[in-house]
């Protein structure tokens, strides 16, 4: 019998285009370690929330065309991280599949719900109070999340329920995402060799 809990769930993805060159290494059963170097400091800060609060080991290195703007780097990092999750999850046997979490950060409160369904879908409502956080264009978060869900093959609901500070709004989202992903990616010891779907596949 296959013991899923003892299987290494580790992936490494390299994605090279004319716009970005990215390498991602992911361990789903880590301790929140890793080095992030996307070239966009605020994106590093947000992915660090996934790493630390999800207890995923994540290494990302990206060389992107930042002389143009951050768009390609942010979107492509989402794509490549999504590919790494899909690869590390493998056949999805034993997964809890669903995860949800509410995360506060001072006045901000966000809810994230994850379904590792195999069906990409992003449903996102973040009423940002300003257009930029420092130099970072908040519109790019939808590009990151869309790339992530499309390639991780998951359904993702993101709702910022309260918030006045845009930094707090998005950081609470990433913290909630981290915990929801952690829950969804965990192995259910009572169902180690089954798929959490009546179809028998995800």
Swiss-Prot record:
GO terms for molecular function: imidazoleglycerol-phosphate dehydratase activity. Its EC number is 4.2.1.19. Keywords: Amino-acid biosynthesis, Cytoplasm, Histidine biosynthesis, Lyase. It comes from the Bacteria. InterPro entries: IGPD_sf, ImidazoleglycerolP_deHydtase, ImidazoleglycerP_deHydtase_CS, Ribosomal_Su5_D2-typ_SF. It catalyses: D-erythro-1-(imidazol-4-yl)glycerol 3-phosphate = 3-(imidazol-4-yl)-2-oxopropyl phosphate + H2O. It holds the Pfam family IGPD. Pathway: Amino-acid biosynthesis; L-histidine biosynthesis; L-histidine from 5-phospho-alpha-D-ribose 1-diphosphate: step 6/9. Coiled coil: none annotated. It is found in: Cytoplasm. One of its GO terms (biological process) is L-histidine biosynthetic process. The keyword Cell inner membrane does not apply. GO terms for cellular component: cytoplasm. SUPFAM superfamilies: Ribosomal protein S5 domain 2-like. NCBIfam families: PRK00951.1-1, PRK00951.1-5, PRK00951.2-1, PRK00951.2-4. Belongs to the imidazoleglycerol-phosphate dehydratase family. This is Imidazoleglycerol-phosphate dehydratase. It comes from Acinetobacter baumannii (strain AYE). The lineage of its organism: Bacteria, Pseudomonadati, Pseudomonadota, Gammaproteobacteria, Moraxellales. The gene is hisB.
């Amino acid at each position: 019998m296959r013991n899923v809990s003892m299987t290494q769930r580790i992936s490494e993805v390299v994605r090279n285009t004319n716009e970005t060159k990215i390498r991602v290494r992911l361990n789903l059963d880590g301790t929140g370690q890793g080095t992030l170097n996307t070239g966009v400091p605020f994106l590093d800060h947000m992915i660090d929330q996934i790493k630390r609060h999800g207890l995923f080991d994540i290494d990302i290195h990206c060389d992107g065309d930042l002389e143009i703007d951050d768009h390609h780097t942010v979107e492509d990092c989402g794509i490549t991280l999504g590919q790494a999750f899909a690869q590390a999850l493998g056949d999805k046997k034993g997964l809890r599949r669903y995860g949800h979490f509410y995360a506060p950060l001072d006045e901000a409160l966000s809810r994230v719900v994850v379904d590792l369904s195999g069906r990409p879908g992003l449903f996102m409502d973040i009423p940002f109070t300003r257009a930029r956080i420092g130099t970072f264009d908040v519109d790019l978060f939808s590009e990151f999340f869309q790339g992530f869900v499309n390639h991780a093959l998951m359904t993702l609901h993101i709702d910022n329920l309260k918030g006045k500070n845009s930094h707090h709004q998005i950081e609470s989202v990433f913290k909630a995402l981290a915990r929801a992903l952690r829950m969804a990616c965990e192995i259910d010891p009572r169902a180690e060799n089954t798929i959490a779907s009546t179809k028998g596949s995800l």
